Amino acid sequence: MKKVLVSVLSFAFIAATAGSALAAGNKAEGAKVYKQQCAACHGDTGKGDGPSAKTLKPAPTNLTDAKLMSSLSDADIAKVIKEGGAKVGKSPLMPALGATWSKQQMDDMVAHMRDLCKC
């Protein structure tokens, strides 16, 4: 009976872990999309210092700010990307990308942003 219980619990753990690993974003893929669609404002390294940033008021968010980024859940970050800044009380200059990005692209971008802030 003990062996059966250990086997069942082991299987449940592996299944749960595998499912979350498959759902996680790919930070390398996120970095590719970031470079194409985000770096002009947020900068190559995420500091909010992209070539367009000088003319933007408010300035783009510094995505390397670990204190700020740690205070946001992955869902919070995805919501800003999906709905745009104006809808969530952030900069109205941040576009809503939910209509053009897949769930996987959102997950990939969140993974890349977590890599930028090391949080």
Positions of predicted regions on the chain:
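Positively charged n-region of N-terminal signal peptides that target proteins for export
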Residues: 1-4
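Bacterial N-terminal signal peptides
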Residues: 8-16
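Sec/Tat signal peptide C-region and signal peptidase I cleavage site
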Residues: 17-23
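Periplasmic/extracellular electron-transfer cofactor-ligation site
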Residues: 25-27, 31-58, 83-92, 116-119
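A short gly/proline-enriched turn/hairpin at secondary-structure junctions
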Residues: 51, 64-65
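Axial heme c-ligation environment in periplasmic c-type cytochrome domains
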Residues: 54-62, 76, 80-107, 113-116
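Alpha-helical hairpin
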Residues: 69-72, 101
